[in-house]
């Protein structure tokens, strides 16, 4: 259930914006996810985010923890993740992942606020 040996280089090139690598990385991710690994390697979610498939990345992330939450949350959502935080699917992600409930008790991060409808809206 591990990623194949070519994954690190392909994923790194994808994260750096290589369009050709992105196509290969997405195909590799599709194959990897078809095997239903548990837990999912966190880099897979990050690659989906950087490949523009934010809804799919958030859906995977909200269903179960990855093997590396700090990578996905730190680098994916908070560091350079404005397009992820502002995606329409982000509010559902915060609810289903438990972040919204945690923020209700502890307060949201600086980039987020609770909207009138109860959803968290982030910049």
Where are these regions (language model features)?
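Alpha-helical protein-protein interaction modules
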Residues: 1-123
């Amino acid at each position: 259930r591990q990623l194949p040996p070519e994954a690190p280089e392909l994923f790194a090139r994808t994260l750096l914006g290589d369009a050709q690598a992105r196509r290969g990385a997405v195909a590799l991710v599709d194959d990897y996810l078809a095997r239903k690994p548990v837990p999912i390697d966190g880099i897979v979610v990050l690659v989906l985010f950087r490949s523009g498939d934010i809804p799919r990345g958030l859906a995977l992330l909200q269903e179960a923890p990855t093997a590396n939450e700090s990578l996905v949350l730190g680098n994916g959502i908070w560091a350079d993740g404005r397009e992820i935080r502002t995606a329409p699917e982000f509010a559902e992600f915060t609810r289903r992942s438990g972040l919204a409930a945690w923020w209700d008790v502890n307060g949201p991060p600086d980039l987020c606020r609770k909207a009138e409808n109860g959803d968290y809206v982030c910049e």
